[in-house]
Amino acid sequence: MGGLPEGHAYFDQLVSEQTGAIVVDADYRVAPENVFPAAIDDADATIKWLQENAEERWGADPTLMTTSGFSAGGNLAFAVTQQKGCQAPSPTAIKAITTFYAVIDFRLSPWEKPHPDNMPKNDPAKVFLPLFDAYAAPARAKHFEDPRLSPVLSEKESLPERILLVVPGIDILVAEQTEFAERINNEDGEREVQRVEILHEKDLFHGYLEVPDIVVKRDIKHRAYKKAIQVLKETHRKYDWTWNA
């Protein structure tokens, strides 16, 4: 299971500098050595520790926590909301989620997921598909309806008021993310700001934020970062926190 923290230091820096947030980028046990629920157990333990210790350790407000993640890390950013202490009306409820090409439906193996028309016919990552399924496959039958494994199943009441999905168009994860957004927003009905927003980068691919700038220019990557930081700032202001760098 990927979505590893080492690749996201630049985004972490932007969030810290532009929002004033205390940013904690956590690691977790990975597959194939550690399958579900190892990673989400580690993420849950991290959130619980932060709720109990972040204020004393760093002066951070445990009642204004948001989560974020890339790829498999996006799965965990969603799945931690299934803890009661991360849901309203708990004061420590997660206030927003921002994810980038998040894996939110493990009910299907990667090769079973719908492939967009613009996916390359000879996918260079095809050889790795069994590895991509190593986290979920051993637990799939038993946990088929478990939102800790497949957050696409989350009830809207368990989710925060603001969610951003950055969805590149050249990716097998497009359908699960767009269908999730449509379901939650339809269940919400009319709102001033939709709960789930999508930034759809139709000509980009899974992992594009983590490749060198010579492959994907930094200004293109910054469209996703800028939108995520906007959502975080708006969430902070809603709860009376503003940052003047």
What is each model feature region?
Residues 1-245:
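Alpha/beta-hydrolase superfamily serine-hydrolase fold, recognizing
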